Swiss-Prot record:
It comes from Pseudomonas aeruginosa (strain ATCC 15692 / DSM 22644 / CIP 104116 / JCM 14847 / LMG 12228 / 1C / PRS 101 / PAO1). The lineage of its organism: Bacteria, Pseudomonadati, Pseudomonadota, Gammaproteobacteria, Pseudomonadales. Its cofactor is pantetheine 4'-phosphate. This is AMB antimetabolite synthetase AmbB. Belongs to the NRP synthetase family. Induction: Expression is regulated by the PhoR-PhoB two-component system. Involved in the biosynthesis of the antimetabolite L-2-amino-4-methoxy-trans-3-butenoic acid (AMB), a non-proteinogenic amino acid which is toxic for prokaryotes and eukaryotes. Adenylates L-alanine and loads it onto its peptidyl carrier domain via a thioester linkage to the phosphopanthetheine moiety. In addition, loads activated L-Ala in trans onto the second carrier domain of AmbE. Can also activate L-Ser, Gly and D-Ala, albeit to a lower extent. Its EC number is 6.2.1.67. GO terms for molecular function: 2,3-dihydroxybenzoate-serine ligase activity; phosphopantetheine binding. Keywords: Ligase, Phosphopantetheine, Phosphoprotein. Residues 734-809 form the Carrier domain. GO terms for biological process: amino acid activation for nonribosomal peptide biosynthetic process; enterobactin biosynthetic process.
Amino acid sequence: MQERHGLPLRSFSSGKALTAGRAVRPEVAQERRYLQGAPLGLELPGRIALRDPHCAWQWFEPEAAAEAFPAAHWLAAFLVLLGRYGNEEITLGFPEPITVRGRQAPALLRSSYRAMESSAERSARLAEELDDARRQLSADGQERAALAGRCAVQVLAARPTASSPGWLALVLAADGSVGLALRDPQYDELRRIAGHLARLARGLVDAQACVGRLPWLDADEERRLQALRSEPQAAPSRGVLHHLFEAQARRTPQRIAVHAADRSLSYAELERESAALAVRLRAAGVAPEQRVGVCLRRDSGLLVGLLGVLRAGGCYVPLDPAYPEERVAYMLDDADCLLVLVDASTRERVAALGRPCLTLEEGGDQANDLALPASEVGADHLAYIIYTSGSTGRPKGVAIEHGSAHAFLRWAGQHYAAEEWSGVLAATSVCFDLSVYELFGTLAEGGTLHLVENLFSLPDYPRRDEISLLNTVPSVCAALLALGDLPGGVRTLNLAGEPLRGHLVRQIRGQPQVRRLVNLYGPTEDTTYSTVHELDLHAEALDEPPIGRPLPGTTVEVLDGFEAPLPLGVAGELYLGGIGLARGYFGKPEQTAERFRVDPGSGERRYRTGDRVRMREDGVLEHLGRLDDQVKFNGFRIELGEIASCLASFPGVSEACAMLTEDSAGLRRLVGYLAAPFAPPLQALNEHLGQSLPHYMLPSAFVVLAELPKTLNGKIDRKALPRPQATGAEPQALPSDPLEQALHQAWQAQLGAPPRAGQGFYAAGGDSLRAVHLLATLRQRLSRRVPLQAFAGGPATPEALLELLRQAAPEGDEPEPSAGAAGLSLAERRLWVAQQLAPEDTSYNLLAHLRIVGATADAIEQALRQLLERHVALRRRVETGVDGPQPHALAAHAVPLQRLLASDAVHAERLLEDGVRREGARVFDLAHEAPARLLLVVTRDSARADLLLSVHHYAFDDVSLAVFAAELKTLLDGGRLGVLASTPEQVAARERAALASGRLDRVAERWAERLLPLAKAPGAAPARPEESGGRAGQRLALPVSAAVHAACRALAERTSVSPFSAALQAFAEVLGAELGVDDLLVGVALAGRSRLEMQGLVGCFVNLLPLAVGLRPEQSVEWRLRQVGHDLLELLEHQDVPLECVTQALRQRGASGLPIRIACGAHNGRAAPAVDAGVRVEADFIPVPGARLDLTLWLEDQPQGWLAVWTGVSAIFDLHRIERLHQAWERRLLANAGEPISKRMSPEGCNAS
């Protein structure tokens, strides 16, 4: 596994790289087989940074060298040392002849580490490995040195020189002397490694000793580890959880305790109502250790309910009302709940399970008159049971005692100041332990809770600016930042529940209101948080920020597979102990004993986390991943084994597993793999899973195989499992009919799943863009053209599309492009002309930022040169001649590529900011220079690099960035790029041929007749400001609420149009009401890439085509929407018709032109290829000031829904007006869908004014 502080691990996939250039002999193929997959890297203690191959060697002779062990003994000890450092497989290079066991060692030796074998077995296996390598490798002399020199670890015959290869070397001299050398400036580190080696060499003398248990730490190391396992501060006191709230209520009775959707409650009111409920619960039999289910909606009653159960002496078991009935029933049975606390919204559902219920709203008046007697509950009684995903297929309840929760809250009160508690957002489900911090931590410290449904309710939350502290998972925080929804009052950010990445820290640094960023780690089994790390927002952000040091009263240890301590810097499993440990898993003694271990030395309990960590010299822990099948997905802890167990229980499935995958577009999703003789029906499979698993554990894709691939030891080989994109969500045998087969494959390519009988394209997750690509694929493969109108007026089922394919006659050949220079396409010419009219205008400069992690600067520069050579659009200047503007390609090296070295991340950011400022103000001289400039900023001693791409719009567009980023990643990962299917010149030539044929003019004339009334009506668009400088722009990115997004999709499905059509219709209606017009001219932004061969091109192909939207109130919503859907599909089908053709046709009819001042567009997310097994490349455009049109709305598809990006000319649409338009647009969408409109979105507010 590649780690940040080690030499990046590499391996040869074929062995050809090692044997390349050698004469082809019969033995070469044999050598390649031996070398296939051989790892050439090295894992060493984390504080050693093996980065500089020119660093001087440090030299040390181990103490045991005086004992004159033979070379084979030292070699075995060295291999054991590397194995215990985490190198399960290692390749040693022998660049010089060395004698081992009386024979010359081979040039390379592949070896593996087996912790359970004895010293004698290790010695015998080493002899076998040496013999095997000698048989399969024949290199000698220069060939030997070339082969061995590729390895990070060397075995030398003499002390290394400056030119010696490798990073770590064991020296076995002919006179029997032994030494270690390391390319690292830290002499003490080498001394420590040598000490480990010496002690292991002595231990190997015992032939029966287990190599994984050989002692290797000295007394100083053991004392140091003991000192770092806990903090010196005294542990917080154990007590009763709700006593903290009761004491606070007595101190500040009138202070507001919670703002919720239904009402606000003071501390006195919350105390009184929870006490009344506690009286009722005690009367129902609740006492210490009695479990009470809590199934309540998320309003003020939730807090009353939780506190009521605690104050009655009971233990609350939270139940999410959205959980499947089977899961709720299992949790109630497993916890043996006495009763369930419900409200009016959940009563019927719980009662249907046959459980005794107590309704929150009933009986409160009588209980208010009764005093709450003192409870017998103590620190050792249960406070709550939270169910987590279980590897056995069933969730398991983590039982937390009052004393553990009390101690945790005491720490929280000391760690955070009073002003930080003044406004805490409570957005986490009570079924997850982060809620314990949010709810009870705030109430213990006299703060005010802001209780919302979830974090994505923030945009509509009226008190959002009162929130001072946010406690959430990194993925949700990243989404909030992307949406621009981080409240302005937030001063403290707690991030927990998932690994925190450096790129998110850098984004948070750009939020001026955030003054404190805290990275917290901890499993539910250790009461929410176990370690804490404060991040310096003014210092360089590491790519993997650490999880910090333990909380007071908590112990941390990094242990190996034998539960023995590991040296500082060596990766192992994290064990937790101390005051926060849970009692165990409720009712599951065997699982409790498996995870909650007893230290044989001290007798203390400690919890096996399953997390792989290492401890730095200062005691700070770094999180490296998981050791088991547990994953964190969107903040939820998920045991993949539970999903696999549920999959395997489906009839016909013999074996199953689940994985969290990440595709090339950066989308993370759960995928289920099934071994079955046939593909089970997708709907039936989803229904089966939905009966047991909560929504966040449901796979979004499935792969069905005849059998799951296995490793040599019989385990499922997860690396060999195919990606879901390749196999699909519900694999089926392809139809035998060629037309049906082509439709099946094209549908699956666009939607990631094969077609299902009767399911419409939009209902299956499609949109207009995917529809275009689907038909383009079919047209290319079958030479049959199905009109896009097939997606209007009906659900566009597979059956309907197949029938249209059968009816479509094969197309004839397209008009051949004429000979001669094609010149510029009309889209390119349009932007070139704009540059000529305003040579100093920089509004068409596009700036993109690409962040690259895991590649060297030389490799990045080489890949960039390849891309510049590949994509001629980035290096074409434009000359003006008798035939008009003509492009002329420059050499790739003529495109400026500047490389700067930054001393640290702060310096890098400053260089980038300077670059953005400089490039944003610098014009392109398209007549004499390439339309692109590149700035590569490399950070010293870091795996990161930043690329600033400055390019004129004439040569680039949105899709181009996605292509550029994806191809850059492919090259940096060592892949090859296929031959481009077209060029910008060929696109322009085809356009010229189509114009000559008259086809484009005929379409344009038809549109012109329809648009003529609007083209002559100047009032159909906002009036432009008279003053100059009206191009100054405002940009506002606002999330579309989940309710609106769902309503829009439902409306689109009901009317058989795309969701974008529904959004566009509402956009036009809101603007029409704003402007007082019955019809509106809207420009629709289109990619202009209707042909498949254009998909992989870098260039400018965008088109802006006019759409007339009727807004007459006498027409029904559905009629208007179907009309927009029909017209939009016509635009998409003919998106190659240039805007100039439409404008010319209008002028021929007496119109002065086409006043497009308002536009709307959509695309499927940003270009952000994510890390899979290689280099990570993240790309995005940098927003530039200014607005080219009066108002534009872009809808960006994101995992959580839509992001609406509004841009307007400042003098017409200020930020306040844009925000009102957005709210009115959402209201209109809900109204059109016939959905209930909330009080905040009343029908009276549909007009934005």
